[in-house]
Amino acid sequence: MNARVESVRALMDERGLDALLIKGKTLKRYLGTVTGSGCKVLITRAGGYLIMDGRYVNEAADIEHDLEFRVHEQGVSYLGELAILIGECDIHRLGAEASQVLVSEYQKLCDLDVEPVLLDGELARMRIIKDEYEIAAVQHAVDVADDVYAKVLEHLHIGMTEYEISALVHYYSIAAGAEAMSFDTIVATGERSALPHGRPTMR
């Protein structure tokens, strides 16, 4: 996680930011932190914080080592805890993901006497260059997909439905170590194979 946090800090330096607020699942996963919607990450020049309600404490404790926990009451906005950190860390320019900030949040940030700086493409570009772990993970995923495809082919026979084929793909993927399917399995036969994202049917 440290190398990726340093990439975030390098971006902060480029944009003259004192801190970066992370709400989106993709970037939280990139940093190896809890991805639940009730978790927000604040990276400052000197440290990092995981702002969350009590539901996530046990999960976070299992995987977090670099972020300081700030826990607020469930059902209460994270902005109260963020306001405390803005004061403690002397934050004046706060970066945030443009696609993740509500208008109401933006207005409240302005009320906290902080300058919100919305980032868009910069965060995506930061993740384009893959590290060794990511390259290995992509290669492993490709290997698993190849293996699953070969196993499913062994079981195909006339009369199988698309649902049955989809179930095999799902089963062998999970058996190989997948956590979940990233989207509905694409299985389409006959003229349905022309569909851009053919979801399985009883055909």
Model-derived regions: residue spans:
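Solvent-exposed alpha-helices and their adjacent loops that cap or buttress functional pockets
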Residues: 13-14, 33-34, 42-43, 88, ...
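Flexible, acidic/His-enriched mid-domain "rim/lid" segments that flank
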Residues: 3, 46, 77-181, 192
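Divalent metal-coordination and catalytic microenvironments
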Residues: 41, 138, 187
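N-terminal accessory/capping or targeting/presequence segment of soluble
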Residues: 1-84, 143-144
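Short acidic, glycine/serine/threonine-rich loops at helix termini
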Residues: 33, 62, 106-108, 128, ...
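Acidic, glycine-rich loop-and-beta core segments that form the ion-binding/anion-interacting portion
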Residues: 176, 180-203
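Short pre-catalytic strand/loop immediately N-terminal to key active-site residues, enriched for Gly-Thr
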Residues: 72, 135, 200
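Fold-independent oxyanion-binding glycine-rich loops
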Residues: 23-25, 34, 53-54, 97-99, ...
